[in-house]
From Swiss-Prot:
This is Phosphate acyltransferase. The gene is plsX. GO terms for molecular function: phosphate:acyl-[acyl carrier protein] acyltransferase activity. One of its GO terms (biological process) is fatty acid biosynthetic process. It comes from Campylobacter jejuni subsp. doylei (strain ATCC BAA-1458 / RM4099 / 269.97). Its main location: cytoplasm.
Length: 328
């Protein structure tokens, strides 16, 4: 059975939504949950019927969102440090944390190490498109990149799309300010030339192409990726709020809204980041899923499902093998 370490107290809202998410996940599929935190606080939240799937790793300190990520290595008593350490010692198969994302990345990179051939790990996240989903990476791990980094991100993203998203030949593109090969800055142009070696590379793509369903994996540096991610979150929230405002304007609008309510629910579910749970940190020697600090129980549940699927695959081995083809 898969063993998942969960940073049980690291999110913005404390342990309650995290534990609720763990319980929902356990009701859907069996796995062993190692809750990292204060067991005196956590144990009363666990129903007896699920106690057999729960273990505890004592940790009484939380790495604050206000702390600098570079300080994560100094305090070995925090929940995130102990969770990552369990993975390093191979006592668990994966880690899920809604705590300080910078600390998670720093600890995972320095404690677990990088995969062979990877110079920098990347955070990958799923973005909804009109057909299914697009994998976008990097979305925050590396604000400054070299062309070789983006090439490695491309390989990692392609393997993830093939193994986890079950896309046999994932269409891979590079984010730029135009589709033409000559467009972009020096980083984009150099990266484009490297990515041409990859058979599934379809060229440059613009920001709007994320949503047209014609790209499976889109590669960019962590600065651009994070800006895109946060902008999309804001746009989605604004659109749904505007729709709510318009519906309230007249009786006819309210009747119309009732008629299409099921469609709106499906749309909201498709565009809701909580449905995707978390973002895998690709390129480290292990499985680390980084969840949003504001994750509710549904997001935690889905992040755990991601961790289970990742752990049941051989994705890290496949990434190293794929990179080896180009480095030989």
């Amino acid at each position: 059975m898969i063993n998942i370490a969960i940073d049980a107290m690291g999110g913005d809202f404390g342990e309650k939504p995290i534990i609720e998410g763990v319980l929902k996940a356990l009701e859907a599929k069996p796995f062993n949950a190692i809750l990292v935190g204060n067991s005196k606080i956590l144990k009363p939240l666990i129903p007896k019927k699920l106690e057999q799937y729960i273990q505890y790793e004592e940790a009484n300190e939380i790495f604050s969102m206000n702390e600098n990520a570079t300080d994560a290595l100094k305090n070995k008593e925090t929940t995130i440090y102990k969770a990552i350490n369990l993975l390093k010692e191979k006592k668990v198969d994966a880690v899920v944390s809604a705590g300080h994302s910078g600390a998670s990345m720093s600890l995972a990179t320095l404690r677990l190490g990088r995969l062979k051939g990877i110079s920098r790990p990347a955070i990958a996240t799923l973005m909804p498109n009109i057909v299914s989903k697009t994998l976008l990476l990097d979305v925050g791990a590396n604000t400054d990149c070299k062309a070789e980094n983006l090439f490695q991100f491309a390989i990692m993203g392609e393997v993830y799309a093939r193994e986890i998203m079950q896309i046999q030949k994932p269409r891979l593109a590079l984010l730029s300010n135009g589709e033409e090969e000559c467009k972009g800055n020096e980083l984009t142009k150099e990266s484009h030339q490297l990515m041409k070696k990859i058979p599934n590379f379809i060229g440059n793509a613009e920001g709007r192409d994320i949503f047209n369903g014609e790209i499976d994996v889109l590669v960019c540096d962590g600065f651009d990726g994070n800006v895109i991610l946060k902008a999309c979150e804001g746009v989605a929230t604004a659109i749904f709020q505007l729709l709510k405002n318009e519906v309230k304007r007249s009786f006819i609008s309210k009747i119309g809204a009732l008629l299409i309510k099921p469609s709106f629910k499906k749309l909201k579910k498709h565009t809701d980041w909580q449905e995707y749970g978390g973002a895998p940190l690709l390129g480290v020697n292990g499985c680390v899923i980084i969840s949003h600090g504001k994750s509710d129980s549904r997001a935690i549940k889905n992040a755990i499902f991601q961790a289970v699927n990742f752990s049941q695959s051989h994705i890290n081995e496949l990434i190293e093998n794929e990179l080896g083809k180009y480095n030989a």
